[in-house]
Amino acid sequence: KMPVQYESIIKEHEAVRSYAGIFDISHMGEFLLEGKDVIEFLQYIMINDLKLLEPSKGQYSCMCYENGTVVDDLVYYEENPERFRMIVNAANIEKDFQWLTDHLEEFDVKITNLSMKRSRIAFQGPKADENLQSLVDVDLSQINRFYFAHCNIQSNPIFIARTGYTGERGFEISFENEFAEKIWNSLLNTGASPAGLGARDSLRLEACYSLYGHEISNSITPVEAGLSWLVKPKEGIDYIGKEVLMKQKSEGTKRTIVGLNLVDKGIIREHYKIFK
């Protein structure tokens, strides 16, 4: 059970924007994909193009149904051409694992669900680099956006990627459960503020990031959700949902996501009607 807030959503939101915040994101899923056909398999099941990847780099993408709607949005990281790490949304762990497994028939790939064995923390904010550098044995300035490294926090082994869900600079870290409390406390001691799911949601909304079940879902396509840049032609590769998505990308859709800017005080709730 993840806390919605530790102190207040506003304070935690502002702490991430002005200094640094720490999020426990251990509820998210983590899979390991291994085998000689991993890249071929992911090219078939993802809408983004893995030819744009390289070892030590991650990529944001979606898995889609044949009708183009979204199974899940996620990030995967290429450790080597036969080994990928994948981070998926918490609500979709079982569904994603089953979806991946159901499409393995023709591919030499093994999928391991590490979700319950590993913990995850997001360390986000303008001071994230500076504060984290004193704790790790790698030069963080050499880890560019969406790249990752294996290193240690005070002798505890971690996987660290320059990714995030706040719109700020920062990192997402994965490690064995046994190190969780020590790593969390080490990060807190840098002066960063713990932040809950409420601030995580307000920060991602401010940064215009999609959340599964809201801006994207099994009834919304990436093109409708403003993610048409993820839909790649991948010449010669017939990936799941390609026909529908490429048509939507070229011809447009009947509906699309838009942002609203309030001119007066108020809160726009999900499913509110728009009258004009």
PLM regions and their residue ranges:
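Conserved, structured C-terminal
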Residues: 1-4, 10, 79-276
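Charged, low-complexity, helix/coiled-coil-prone segments
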Residues: 32-47, 71-79, 122-133, 188
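Acidic, proline/glycine-enriched N-terminal capping motif
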Residues: 1-61, 69-71, 198
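A generic structural motif
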Residues: 34, 64-66, 263, 275
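Well-ordered mid-protein domain cores that form the structural environment of catalytic cofactors
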Residues: 49-103
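Membrane-targeting and insertion segments and their boundary/processing signals
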Residues: 12-16, 67-70, 74, 106, ...
